[in-house]
Amino acid sequence: MATIPSTEGAAERRETESGALARGLNVLSRLHEAARPLSLQEIADSVGLAASTCHRLLQSLDQAGYVYREGSLYCPTPRAACPLPLEHPLNRLRRDTAPLMRELQERHGPSVLLIAFMGNHRATVDSVAGNYSVAPYFDTNVSAPLHASVSGKILLSDRTPEQRDLLLGPAPFPARTEFTIRDRAALYAELDQVRQRGWATNENENVIGICAVGTRLTAPSGRAVGAMVLTGPSRFFKKGNQAMRDDLLKSAELLNSTSHAVRAMSQFLGI
């Protein structure tokens, strides 16, 4: 007589499988972050797993085509390192925006960022480093506080007050510097202005000595798909940011009206 699996047993297997998936993704993340081949022990130490467990995960990733071995070292395959096809909307947006970003950087000096909105997440799609001695570092995952960053304000301006409340939590909002807007009414009033005018600023609100200005990239539906941002030391902003704003708005208008990548991004995001 056939044995019918118990509900508890099926749930336990699902939990085990999801745990293995999370550990495998963590291993891939460490390989990407290292930017060099890693030994089994290096990977195991970095993810906090026993070498035997890590070895089984790497074998599974190898069989699935996500890692390969170079002697005793492990490396990500092209499938893992470059998962997006060349014609993916994010890659198309990067290519369409690159000449405009270089022109903005050369004209004004600060770094230029192209940021995409994926739900309530922000991703740096491309960057052009500014003209200053300290090389800036921009992570793919944008973690700057929503209420104290240009990309965050543009994203929040695209949300309802109720959605903003869920994203920000209760006021007063955390202070990053003495210039951070912490009051709910003051911040929401600024966000409404950002929505109307299409651009946002950060004047020493996240890091003292760093300012930024940026404009939204807009889907045909009117929703924001991302932002273009000029950011750098406050000395670039001593004479104000109107010239930067004007050029950013022109660049965004050009992309919004002519770039098929912006339309493709709106389809990709479902907005």
Annotate each language-model stretch with its function.
Residues 2-91, 253, 257-261:
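N-terminal helix-turn-helix
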Residues 2-5, 134-206:
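Short, solvent-exposed recognition segments
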Residues 30, 95-107, 113, 193, ...:
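Amphipathic alpha-helical regulatory segments at dimerization interfaces
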Residues 76-170:
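Amphipathic alpha-helical effector-binding/dimerization core
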Residues 106-107, 204-209:
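Short loop/turn motifs at secondary-structure junctions and domain boundaries
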Residues 197, 208, 225-271:
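Juxtadomain coupling helices with adjacent low-complexity linkers
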Residues 208-216:
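A short beta-strand signature within small-molecule sensing/ligand-binding domains used
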